[in-house]
Amino acid sequence: MSRPVALVTGGGQGIGAATCKRLAQDGYDVLLTYNTSSQPAEMLVDEIRESGYDALAVKVDCANDGEVGLLGIHPWMARKIDVLILNHGAYRRVAADQMTIETLRNTMAINFEGAVGVYKAVQPHMTDNARMVVVGSQLGIRGSPHGADYSASKAALAVWARSLAQQ
């Protein structure tokens, strides 16, 4: 019998890496994405494999529809996804009154639209009992004077996730 599969976006470092390690400890094979740095992601893959589970890191810019689309046809999708963790994100500290529309659009493209895109690409390959976790932030509730764009993107994610849960 094959092991369950977890997909973690932004899994190469930080909260994502810790989540990948925990999922492997809980018996999952892990497909993780990274965007900017392959080395930490590959080191994590090696660590998970050494513990007896399978893991693979793939480069995906979640703001790039083409790369997200390729994730949706990745060979691991044939194994079916049991857990989807939408963890990727970008946070650039910019004072709220200095934020440009371009900055806002870029952050929303990565953090919000990217998460929706990954979900749409992967959803046909999720098991009937699959679970999804959307990693949020308290800044999505209370805002931030140095990250209004990030706060808005996390608020959008929270509302979107609640909307999906109501279906």
Predicted regions and their residues:
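Conserved glycine-rich cofactor-binding loop
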Residues: 12-13
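Conserved glycine-rich Rossmann-like NAD(P)H-binding loop of the short-chain dehydrogenase/reductase
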Residues: 28-42
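Substrate-binding pocket helix/loop in short-chain dehydrogenase/reductase
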Residues: 95-96, 100-105
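Active-site loop immediately N-terminal to the catalytic Tyr-X3-Lys motif
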Residues: 97, 142-148
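Active-site helix of classical SDR
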Residues: 119, 153
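Alpha-helical segment proximal to the catalytic Tyr-Lys
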Residues: 124, 166-167
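Residue(s) in the substrate-gating loop at a strand-loop-helix junction
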Residues: 137
